[in-house]
């Protein structure tokens, strides 16, 4: 089990230090998730609680990764993103697949198998699997918009566009194509900001769907 305490498989611009918080800039940027989560929780309501808890969970797991800088904490970070995309998939697929219990079990098994595959193959396996789940989510949203089960497609496109912009900065950071001495402006940090904003915008999007007259 020693490999779980080894160094992560992805090296970003901010080098890990021998400190209580290994990557202080990246760790600090996770505050964006905490702020978004608290704002959502203060709004009240079912969707605000759901997305507020999601934001807090993603931010906390990501902070643990940046603070401890181990392969195990990298898995925590990836787990947070898998949980996020899993919830989004459930919200969409529950409008397509009527048996919600089977859907929930199927998604849970799929996410668990994804995490196992990440542990086995390491490298960028987590990012590849997460990318595949994102593609499935995009396809489900396009289907729901085209079949009029969802509306406000422009609002969803803006949220996804912001996520995509952050992901591009993340890629630049992971490949060391864009690095700055001020770590709060490095790609991984920017990815945190855009993800926190995306979670809030997706909350607004799904709240609009819940308030729509039933078709």
Q: Across the structure, where does each feature detected by a protein language model lie?
A:
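Multi-pass alpha-helical transmembrane bundles in non-GPCR membrane proteins
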Residues: 1-215
């Amino acid at each position: 089990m020693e490999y779980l305490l080894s160094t992560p498989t992805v090296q970003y611009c901010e080098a890990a230090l021998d400190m209580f918080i290994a990557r202080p800039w990246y760790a600090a940027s996770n505050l964006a998730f905490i702020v978004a989560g608290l704002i959502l929780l203060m709004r009240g309501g079912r969707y605000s609680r759901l997305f507020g808890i999601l934001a807090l969970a993603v931010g906390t797991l990501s902070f643990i990764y940046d603070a401890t800088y181990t392969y195990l904490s990298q898995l925590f970070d990836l787990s947070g993103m898998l949980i996020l995309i899993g919830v989004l998939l459930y919200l969409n697929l529950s409008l397509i697949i009527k048996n919600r219990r089977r859907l929930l079990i199927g998604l849970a098994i799929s996410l668990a198998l994804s995490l196992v595959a990440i542990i086995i193959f390491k490298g960028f396996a987590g990012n590849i699997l997460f990318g595949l789940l994102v593609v499935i989510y995009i396809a489900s949203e396009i289907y729901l918009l085209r079949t009029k089960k969802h509306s406000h497609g422009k609002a969803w496109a803006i949220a996804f566009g912001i996520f995509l912009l952050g992901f591009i900065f993340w890629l630049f950071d992971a490949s060391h194509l864009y690095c700055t001495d001020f770590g709060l402006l490095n790609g991984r940090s920017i990815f945190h900001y855009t993800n926190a904003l995306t979670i809030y915008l997706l909350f607004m999007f799904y709240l609009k769907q819940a308030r729509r007259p039933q078709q």
